[in-house]
Amino acid sequence: MATNGNKKEYDYVVALDIGTSKVVCLIGQLTDSHAVEIVALGSYPSSGLKKGVVVNIDATTDAIQKSMDQAKNSFDGKLKNVYVGIAGNHIKSLNSHGIVGIKDKEVTPFDIDRVIEAAQAVAIPSDQKVLHVLPQEFVIDDQDSIREPLGMSGVRLESHVHLVTCANNAIQNIEKCVKRCGITLDGFVLEQLASSYSVLSEDEKELGVCIVDIGGGTTDTVSYTHLRAHETY
């Protein structure tokens, strides 16, 4: 396993922002306080995307590879796994809810999983897939605005969630480009959601805030109230 000093490979997170105007590769080191410290960055102009969607496989692959090569110039390790930010007009979202009975009259992790799964049981177009399920609040019997229901007593558990979906073909084309570069794709993250994690404070998300991510081909937003994402565009 590749190392950088005394750090193991799994102490690093690699992220790709595959944008319309450029591709950026970030390598972050996980600190003892569970924060991420950026240790390497690579950037290369992109010509293979339009409005966040791949329109040229070869050009996109080349930009990804060259951005990673730049990042590796200051990183003593091997890039094997990566998370990719995703945006574009193919991203859709909706709010949904689910209801289940609480099996043993006390909420368990299994109950939480079931009620979130129930909230996902909505019809989405066959050419779309679920990207994120973002819990907003839980309701136990008549008590609402619950953020963490684990261990609470009740009979009926409800969940309100924000669902984000993306086009299957958009995902598949990005996967193809990443795999051509010889690395494993760990997952996708909605671009504006990733941006909000890095720039918004807990107080801002509690009081209510909207972040606007202006890119070369798309402008994307996410709004928060009471610490939860309620709308994404």
Question: Model-flagged regions — what are they?
Answer:
Residues 23, 217-221:
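Short glycine/serine/threonine-rich phosphate/pyrophosphate-binding segments
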Residues 226-233:
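Single conserved hydrophobic/aromatic residue that forms the stacking wall/gate
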